[in-house]
């Protein structure tokens, strides 16, 4: 089966916004007008097609990114293929949005015309900046009371530090909103209410908007000619670019992320959606317009590029795992190069495992279509993959590449979680396992002593959302304990310990003597074992027992029972007995030897230090820095980003609980922060004494 659409006619884009700016409604209208939906799904009546989990339809919010493929004929009469990702905007925790942005070529940022740029808009905008995603802006809800298009334009400049190129002006506002002025064609589009937005009339610009239209067209041309020397020169000499040239310049500037074309309308009242679809065709990039994806060649370890070309070897990135009630586990993948056939064997280069593609599905929200083949630029859902998780690369087994090594750091915070009722017990286990499969930075374990279920993650917020998703998606009610920080212990100086284990009680006894040097491991946090035995004072077959004995006690340090990091042990001497010695005897001896030595080798408590990035408007910088210092934070630096200031700091995790609430009240909800584990650092002695007192009583 040959490719149906040329790759230059693909548009892979997402819709990003603050909660309630109308993302799902806008996507619904796109599906309706592009012919994928026979009935307009309304979030208000629980029929939206993109929101296909029951909980989403009940609540009118989008929980998971649903991917859908649809088609649209642009103004030039050419059909384009759209792969759309609908992303959630309702959570602080925006890993879903990040995952989507990594595999998209462009995005539409939705604004609520009443609220303008809201805090979550700032967050997703910054994420898109990070991945350099070309964006257009759609000022939605123009029919709402208090809708103000011009204020939204101003807020894009002041709040986001971005340049919006206004492409349309609204005709009327609030209940009087009728249509838009097209600033390129210089005409008016007025929608007919009775046609569900399918029909509109092209008329002259209303008299009261003529002057404003001329002013904004002038601004539009001034902005776009700046990116092209020849156009700029012509403009300064009084030669105006024609409409095709203006469109070409808008496209170039959008793809180069120099500015963002801005449109307006009301998806709910079916006005302004079709021109937005035309704009997706005209201004957002195809996979050919963006730089080739870089990867690591598995054979040579050198950097290579994969281009969006069917003739290149297959490479794709798994960006989301979803559980489908009918098909089971689905792995959503973006194909960057080559082509994929159903039943093909692919290599997961991250897990170093081969996978077979069972079924290949084209997703339309909650309905699915089996396909035999997929090509570069496609976003597909694969069924039947056993090993693959988020961030894995799948590729041609003969041309192996790793597209993006994703680091999933060790969890730094854990809480005990218990089901509220007996009936929730089994459901909770299932829910936690499913959530762990979807999110590699989340872990589940059982505490051996108490039998409690412990969930661990990257921060307080992360675990809050896991518990919330469990309740919402799996209907499991659970009680959670107080968060616990994952402290560690280490030793700070060299110490030599000589220990003899002797046990005689009739029959065969036990005997083993070990002399071991313990010291900090200069190579990192791992445990390192070495043997310098010469002359057979400890026979070769007993040496693994010595190593095993030490390893068995590293999980509980001498200060407060936390796991130990960065220990090096060197066995230098010992003694054995022909009859009474055994591997077990040497294991017991080395275990006791280490316990004795750890107390004398300068045992020290370590705490997880988080790399914290706060993005705040300038007005709040002093307060934010003062607050971080009061949390034992070390400021690493600050820089300007647009009109915001980015503050980087290392802060102990123990002092970051409830930080999100503090930051919100400090900045009136306008600052955001992100936090990742960075390294373990010694705990100051006064704090260490408190921690030891608290945890020693529990051990």
From Swiss-Prot:
Protein biosynthesis in keyword set: yes
Q: Which SUPFAM superfamilies match?
A: EF-G C-terminal domain-like, P-loop containing nucleoside triphosphate hydrolases, Ribosomal protein S5 domain 2-like, Translation proteins
What's the superkingdom here?
Answer: Bacteria
**Protein residues bound to GTP:** 17-24, 86-90, 140-143
Q: Which CDD domains match?
A: EF-G, EFG_III, EFG_mtEFG1_IV, EFG_mtEFG_C, EFG_mtEFG_II
Kindly list the biological process annotations in GO that this record carries.
Answer: ribosome disassembly
Task: Give every tr-type G domain span.
Answer: 8-288
Enumerate the GO terms in the molecular function aspect.
GTP binding; GTPase activity; guanosine tetraphosphate binding; translation elongation factor activity
UniProtKB keywords: Cytoplasm, Elongation factor, GTP-binding, Nucleotide-binding, Protein biosynthesis
Main localization, broad class: cytoplasm
Write out the GO cellular component annotations: cytoplasm
User: NCBIfam families, from UniProt?
Assistant: EF-G (TIGR00484), PRK12740.1-5 (NF009381), small_GTP (TIGR00231)
Stated family: Belongs to the TRAFAC class translation factor GTPase superfamily. Classic translation factor GTPase family. EF-G/EF-2 subfamily.
The protein depicted here goes by the name Elongation factor G
Origin species, per record, is Allorhizobium ampelinum (strain ATCC BAA-846 / DSM 112012 / S4) (Agrobacterium vitis (strain S4))
Which lineage do the record's taxonomy fields give for this organism?
Answer: Bacteria, Pseudomonadati, Pseudomonadota, Alphaproteobacteria, Hyphomicrobiales
